[in-house]
A protein has these predicted regions:
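Metal-dependent phosphoester-hydrolase catalytic domains
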Residues: 1-3, 14-35, 187-195, 203-275
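Extracellular/periplasmic catalytic domains that process cell-envelope and extracellular macromolecules
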Residues: 37-40, 66-67, 92-93, 117-120, ...
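Active-site surface patch of divalent metal-dependent phosphodiester/phosphate bond hydrolases
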Residues: 42, 51-138, 214-219
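A well-ordered secondary-structure block
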Residues: 114-162, 166, 252-254
């Protein structure tokens, strides 16, 4: 009889210690799926306009990123709360751990929710497997129809520090505004011998407003050039190339453009050579 009582007490203690999970528990205590990626692909960088507002689950966005496991991810049209959820899903569901830096250009309740008196942050973000330093967040003097800007961080790619930029230029028929934005961005990029410039430039390769960028850097796709002879796969659902991985002082090894059901912009990633 004492043995039975002791066993019962031990069982109750175990239940009390393990429990059923308190409200607010996240996935961090759950086993990762058997097919979890668990590690990033070194020297792979990605850019993706998330599409906002779009009715897309952040778990699906995270799964798309995890499928290619880039070392550095730049996202545009991003709400800070969504990026945080994406980062959590990447770690808890896919075993990929990222640092995150934000480049907020505005606070917009319609785009990012929040409270009327404290709307959510909207803009760009960079996720990096390696730590990031020296973050800057710059709003262009003229955003056009909506505030726009660029952010930049320093992180390690190929074993060396590299400046990484993430930007989103003005949309539609605002060529003059984009030209001014390109001038601001190019002046900063020119300060670095090695730089990766990612983003949605809202301009096709031969658009005059991109001339300053082409003078400083090359596309990760060697066939893509700012001339009629260039061959540049589209990166949007409307069959235009608006998204770029510009490289300065870094050679590309491979690149891919990947349509996705979760945005009107395709995923674009590049594998980089020695930095």
């Amino acid at each position: 009889m004492p043995l039975l009582v002791g066993a019962a007490i031990l069982a109750l203690v175990c239940v009390a210690l393990v429990g059923r999970g308190a409200p607010g528990d996240d996935l961090s205590g759950r086993a990762l799926p058997a097919d979890a990626v668990r590690d990033v692909v070194p020297n792979r960088v990605m850019t993706w306009n998330l599409c906002n507002p779009c009715d897309t689950d952040d778990a699906d966005r995270a799964a798309q990123i995890a499928a290619y496991a880039p070392q550095v991810v730049a996202v545009q049209e991003a709400c800070a709360r969504d990026v945080e959820k994406i980062r959590n899903h990447l770690e808890n569901r896919h075993g990929l751990v990222y640092h995150v830096a934000y480049g907020t250009v505005l606070r917009n309740w319609g785009r990012c929710g929040g409270k009327p008196w404290s709307p959510g942050a909207y803009g760009q973000a960079v996720l990096s497997a390696a730590p990031m330093t020296d973050r800057v967040d710059v709003e262009y003097p003229d955003g056009g129809s909506e505030d726009r800007g660029y952010m930049a961080v320093t992180t390690t790619v190929g074993g060396r520090p590299v400046r990484v930029f993430n930007t989103h230029f003005a949309e539609r028929r605002q060529e003059a505004v984009r030209a001014e934005q390109a001038a601001v961005l190019a002046a900063e990029v020119a300060r670095y011998d090695r730089a990766i410039v990612l983003g949605d430039f809202n301009a096709v390769p031969d658009a005059p407003e991109l001339g300053r960028m082409w003078a400083l850097a090359a596309d990760a796709d060697p066939r893509c050039r700012p001339s009629s002879a260039g061959t540049c796969p589209p990166t949007t659902d409307w069959h235009s190339k608006f998204d770029y991985v510009f490289l300065r002082g870094i050679a590309p090894l491979a690149h891919r453009v990947l349509p996705t059901p979760y945005s009107d912009h395709h995923l674009l990633h590049a594998d980089l050579g020695p930095v």
